[in-house]
Amino acid sequence: MNTAGRLLLLCLVLGLVFESLGIPVADDLEADRDTDPDEKDPSVHNYWRNVNCGGVPCKFGCCREDRCREIDCD
């Protein structure tokens, strides 16, 4: 048990040393693979659209239940 505690302490100290030196650890190396491709494209998250509202263009934000709420009418 004493050896396991020392080994754990050594690993923690080495991790802190490498982190302070700026050497990337395994979690930093995998950061590029963890990103969602939809996060890079902001148009995917744009829920606003222009709708013809009786000849007047209006901006609507649609819910999942297809109920629209008028946000801004020109």
Swiss-Prot record:
Disulfide bonds join C53-C63, C58-C68, C62-C73. Its main location: secreted. Expressed by the venom duct. It is found in: Secreted. Keywords: Disulfide bond, Secreted, Signal, Toxin. Belongs to the conotoxin H superfamily. Probable toxin with unknown function. Does not produce any changes in intracellular calcium levels in mouse dorsal root ganglion cells. In vivo, does not produce behavioral changes when intracranially injected into mice. This is Conotoxin Vc7.2. It comes from Conus victoriae (Queen Victoria cone). The lineage of its organism: Eukaryota, Metazoa, Spiralia, Lophotrochozoa, Mollusca.
